[in-house]
UniProtKB/Swiss-Prot annotation:
InterPro entries membership: DUF677 (IPR007749)
Keyword Nucleotide-binding carried by entry: no
Cell compartment(s), UniProt: Membrane
Organism in which the protein naturally occurs: Arabidopsis thaliana (Mouse-ear cress)
UniProt keyword list: Membrane, Transmembrane, Transmembrane helix
Main location group: membrane
Keyword hit for Transport: no
Gene Ontology CC, one term: membrane
Family: Belongs to the UPF0496 family.
Domain of life of the native organism: Eukaryota
Protein name according to UniProt: UPF0496 protein At5g66660
Topological type in the membrane: Multi-pass membrane protein
Chain segments annotated as transmembrane: 240-260, 263-283
């Protein structure tokens, strides 16, 4: 039954995409080999948590925050409401992880400066955060294009109001009464969907960078373990980075899977808050849940042929608003000829345009909110990067 349920979910999702939006573009295949591939690293991390109280505290906090984000994604998946807010929530979570990593770097700045391998980790950190900045910038650019569309539709409303009071309708001019209004409405349609393929490209880029980051950390951690086994600070920093990267890939994997198969993320979230005696073991336990859920759903993540365009799902609510606006516009265009002939219908037309105006106000307000969130995310990441540079570059060379 679970197998059939998964297939049904996928078929429903695919048919819905065909009905409600453009064909989907492929997204990155989700990683499911993490637990087995990094089993020794996870064991090392668990052992380190037992010996290091600071690392144990970090792990406990990380566990709690990860449970929150996974539970939130599961709740949204159950209601089929994964949208731009969900994606921004995930990136806010990743931002928080990066900020915590920055604090660890600063607290260990002397060791960072003296150890070339640890400095290499910092370099990888900057490369990783630059990808997140790119994504935030893309969101902001999409918001700017959306604002242009809303200015056009607002102007269309003003044109309608102006042309509605124009009584100079002689002969054939009656049919041309709303010419300017129609021109603006057509411009609005021509603008299309401001949230195009850029977002899915940026999401893939961030995801790839996180996986590369994790692989590089794996190599660097082993070097540090061999060279600096007795240096507590170095082990702590490397473990913090490893945990941050590992959880980032886990959460991004769950997000990508949720786009096409909500039951998977729900299975991951179920029981994820249960107490685990050994600190650090929750990494393996959570990923094990994820693997089992995927296998139950016919190896969903590994074999899925029907990929999902991330921005189609992430921007679901936004696209719904635009589709509703287009529906109103289409209805308005059909009633224009009748509205100019009958006063009652013209008043109805005016009410319809006022309704559009109110809806656009709410839409624009939401877009501004998303833009502010993206700008805030960019600002915090940029400040964190500068803060790291100030502390590291400000240290004496000797």
């Amino acid at each position: 039954m679970e197998f059939c349920g998964c297939l049904s979910e996928l078929m429903n999702g695919e048919s819905s995409s065909k009905r409600n939006g453009p064909s989907t573009l492929p997204v990155k295949e989700v990683r499911t080999d993490m637990r087995s591939k990094y089993s020794s690293d996870l064991s090392s991390y668990t052992s380190a948590c037992k010996k290091d109280s600071n690392l144990k505290s970090f792990d406990s906090s990380l566990h709690q925050r990860t449970n929150i984000i996974i539970t939130s994604l599961a709740a949204r998946a159950e209601t089929q409401s994964l949208n731009l807010d969900s994606l921004m929530e995930v990136y806010g979570f990743l931002l928080e992880l990066n900020q915590n990593a920055v604090r660890v770097i600063i607290e260990s700045r002397e060791d960072v400066w003296k150890n070339k391998d640890l400095k290499s980790l910092v370099d990888v950190y900057f490369k990783s955060t630059s990808k997140t900045l790119d994504f935030c910038n893309t969101v902001e650019n999409c918001v700017k294009r959306t604002e242009i569309s809303q200015l056009i539709i607002r102007f269309a409303v003003k044109q309608f109001e102006a042309e509605s009071v124009d009584t100079d309708l002689g002969g054939d001019k009656k049919k041309k009464k709303y010419t300017k209004t129609l021109e603006e409405l057509n411009k609005f349609k021509a603008m299309g969907d401001p949230f195009d393929g850029e977002l899915v490209t940026q999401f893939d880029s961030v995801y790839d960078q996180q996986v590369l980051f994790l692989e590089e950390l794996r190599k660097q951690r082993r070097k540090l373990d061999k060279k600096q086994r007795n240096v507590k600070t170095l082990r702590t920093v490397s473990n913090v980075f490893f945990a941050t990267a590992y959880v980032s890939v886990l959460v991004l994997s769950v997000v990508a899977t949720t786009m096409s198969a909500p039951p998977v993320v729900c299975a991951v979230a179920s029981g994820s808050t249960a107490p685990i005696e050994i600190t650090g073991k929750w990494f393996s336990q959570m990923w094990k849940k994820y693997e089992k859920a995927v296998k139950r759903q016919r190896g969903l993540v590994l074999t899925m042929e029907s990929r999902v365009q991330v921005n189609n799902e992430a921007m679901k609510n936004i696209r719904s608003d635009v589709d509703e606006l287009r529906s109103w516009v289409s209805s308005i265009l059909e009633t224009v000829d009748f509205a100019v002939e009958r006063e009652e219908e013209e008043e109805a037309m005016g009410l319809a345009m006022q309704g559009i105006k109110k809806h656009v106000d709410g839409f624009t307000e939401k877009m501004e909110e998303v833009g502010e969130n993206a700008a805030k995310c960019s600002k915090f990441i940029a400040l964190g990067r500068l803060l790291v540079l100030e502390h590291i570059l400000g240290l004496p060379a000797n």
